[in-house]
Regions:
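A conserved amphipathic terminal alpha-helix motif
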Residues: 2-8, 129-172
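A short, structured loop/turn motif at beta-sheet edges
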Residues: 32-36, 86-92, 113-123
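Intrinsic-disorder/low-complexity, polar/charged segments enriched in Ser/Thr/Lys/Arg/Asp/Glu/Gln
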Residues: 21-27, 70, 80, 93, ...
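A generic structural micro-feature
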Residues: 18-20, 75-77, 102-106, 118-120
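Short, solvent-exposed aromatic-acidic interface loops
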Residues: 99-103, 127-134
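Hydrophobic/aromatic beta-strand elements that line small-molecule binding cavities or substrate pockets
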Residues: 26-28, 81-87, 98, 108-116, ...
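Hydrophobic ligand-binding cavity/cleft-lining segments
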Residues: 1-62
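Glycine-rich portal/gate segments that line the openings of hydrophobic small-molecule binding cavities
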Residues: 30, 49-50, 58-103, 155-171
């Protein structure tokens, strides 16, 4: 995890982490929950299988440095996917990249952002960026099912963060 290149003096820009296009733009509104609590739930690798429908198991690496976080998620369909946190600025946002032998999304980078809109209320955003879905069969399959899988997963996440109004906009 790192806070570079964004600092308190410079605004955050996803372009500092990827040039891939936005493919999925998702959000969950939450109430009666602090942004820090929402961030803690979404940012905890051990909780991924509690809400993401394709996640079977998560193994977090021992941190090699104080500011690094890497872990591996075993997914139905994708197998083992490595996730590396590129930016960690709790409770506002984090950015991670994901890759794996059977992970069809090339140059995948995601942004998780929590915005407080009122005391103990706000919006959790999850944006997925990638250049392509590798393979014709994967393109046909994932362009149809990925938005729905993520929506179902965010509905499950909503139960953990007192969320509602799940929205998924696909650019696939």
């Amino acid at each position: 995890m790192t806070s570079a290149p964004a600092t308190s003096d410079t605004p955050f820009a996803i372009g500092d982490y990827t040039s891939a296009p936005l493919r999925l733009d998702m959000q969950v509104r939450f109430t009666n929950q602090s942004p820090a609590t929402v961030f803690d739930v979404m940012g905890d690798p051990a909780q991924i299988q509690n809400w993401y429908v394709l996640a079977k198991d998560t193994v977090v690496d021992e941190q090699t440095a104080k500011d690094e976080l890497q872990f591996e998620v075993d997914f139905i369909l994708f197998g083992k996917v490595r996730e590396e946190v590129l930016l960690w600025t709790p409770p506002q946002r984090y950015v991670y990249r994901a890759f794996g032998e059977h992970f069809p999304f090339k140059d995948y980078v995601a942004l998780i952002e929590v915005e407080e809109t009122a005391p103990n209320a706000g919006v959790l955003r999850w944006q997925q960026y990638f250049t392509e879905i590798e393979g014709e069969d994967n393109q046909r399959l994932h362009s149809v099912i990925l938005p729905h899988l993520n929506e179902v997963s965010l509905q499950r996440l909503a139960t953990l963060i007192n969320g509602s109004d799940v929205s998924v906009v696909s650019h696939l």
